[in-house]
């Protein structure tokens, strides 16, 4: 953890490569998952998928009860029908005011697909739909 009095950065172990970051700055709480996700690959060994789910849950449980003003979370269509698991698990542990999907490989409709799923009923209004590369928002 880095805390210089203005910026506080906490790192979390990834379930793939790199790390995830929780940044606190100027009264804002910003979470960037990087590759920390519930990776469930169809065709992968069932025990591997089970271990991945456990590892993801262990990391996000460290953030239990916190509120992120902005959360950047993987929503990867390569996972097929399981593309939404990471976001769905995350919002059960952490309140996120705005969710920015990432890792969607140019499939811009993936957020819209999640928003139509019954599991997202409690948070679909917080998912930001991204329509093109380079799009920007003011929060």
Language-model segment annotations:
Residues 15, 36, 72-77, 111-119, ...:
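Noncatalytic linker/hinge segments flanking ATPase motor cores
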Residues 31-34, 51, 70-76, 98-105, ...:
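Active-site neighborhood of phospho(di)ester-bond hydrolases with catalytic His/Asp-centered motifs
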